[in-house]
């Protein structure tokens, strides 16, 4: 059975990783965005250039290499408790040129704010399968 939730490199992201490897210049994963898919579940496609409906974007919190698989890069976003009031159904990672590198769908999750009576810090991770983690 195929995975219902997954992350993919966009067409641009695939080219950017290849260029980073060939030029030996690391790819700068700069920002991480979340969106609500305009109220609908989304399916990742390589030709995507933006989230369906972006709700929050911030600098990437961390980029790490998977210690068990050197072809996986883990990108993290921490959303503080004072940001929210929306559902999360999609995620995207952007480079320092504001171009979408990777896109993922996720199970629907509500991100509350403290003002609603239930604030929480939320950490999201996107795991990217790449040909070589040397590009990051």
Question: Where are these predicted regions, by residue range?
Answer:
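N-terminal assembly/attachment segments of tailed bacteriophage virion structural proteins
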Residues: 1-136
């Amino acid at each position: 059975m195929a995975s219902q939730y997954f992350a993919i490199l966009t067409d641009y992201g695939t080219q950017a990783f290849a260029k980073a490897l060939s030029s030996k210049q690391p790819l700068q994963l700069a920002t991480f965005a979340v969106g609500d898919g305009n109220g609908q579940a989304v399916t990742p496609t390589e030709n995507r250039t933006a989230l369906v409906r972006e709700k929050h974007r911030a600098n990437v919190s961390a980029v790490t290499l998977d210690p068990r698989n050197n072809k996986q890069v883990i990108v993290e976003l921490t959303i503080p408790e004072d940001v929210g009031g929306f559902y999360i159904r999609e995620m995207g990672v952007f480079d320092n040129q504001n171009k979408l590198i990777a896109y993922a769908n996720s199970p629907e999750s509500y991100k509350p704010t403290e003002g609603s009576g239930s604030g929480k810090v939320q950490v999201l991770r996107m795991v990217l399968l790449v040909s070589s983690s040397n590009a990051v």
